[in-house]
Amino acid sequence: MIQGSTSRPIMQPQTLQELCLDEACLIPTDSYTRLPWTLKDQLLKKLTRRGKCTDDIFSWLIHSRVTELDLHACLISDAGVEYLKTTKCLKVLYMPEPPVVENNNFSENSLMGLGEGKSMLRVVALNGLCGVTDGVIGSLVGGCPQLQEVHISSTSITNHALTALANLTQLVCLNIGKTQISDIGIQQLVSGGVGQSLRELRIDGCVRLTDDSIESICHCCTHLNILCFHHCPRLSDRSRELVDEYKAWRMKQLTWTVY
């Protein structure tokens, strides 16, 4: 009888393809331009996952058929953003964010063109970048009318950005935490089609919001099941009571702070 045996996870050996990709990561970057786009795509994914994608590498590997880019751990600059103009098939984009880059690493001018010609874009994350302004969001909404997820916490947006976002009738998830929005902006956001489509809303750390915002959300966002409004010092117990009255029974995630 065997006692005390323990199971250990078995390490899977790398495939030949993975080994070849690891070797390809080591070749001179100017050789990347001669690679087929399918191989460029795999190299791009591997390097971005490792946070090894720089402006130089980006310039050689980016191509028009790219559909997903997760750059949150990559150190690129305005020059790298320029290369994104060719990615007309892009569906998912996560931009670099602090502390990997400085919050002012990307200028408003470079970000203004981010949504041009990207009608297929569904998910975009621009968290922590002060270059993200109302103008940038307006341009993004104009070029990407089918956006479903927008993550723009800790940016420079105001209520004007929420007015633009209110036009995204397919918007399901919105993160606008730690911004200078107010009750008026929230009311403008949820009073239209967005109120019917939103499933997740994160407004944590928005110090200008009051109970009026929570009331608007509870009345208008009929399908909401994730709501985060912790660290909002102007909210009172009334907000929690409103959520209990209208939404608590259907919530999957709910966070708030008692002051």
Walk through the language-model features, giving the residues of each.
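Conserved hydrophobic beta-strand positions in leucine-rich repeat
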Residues: 67-71, 93-96, 122-127, 147-152, ...
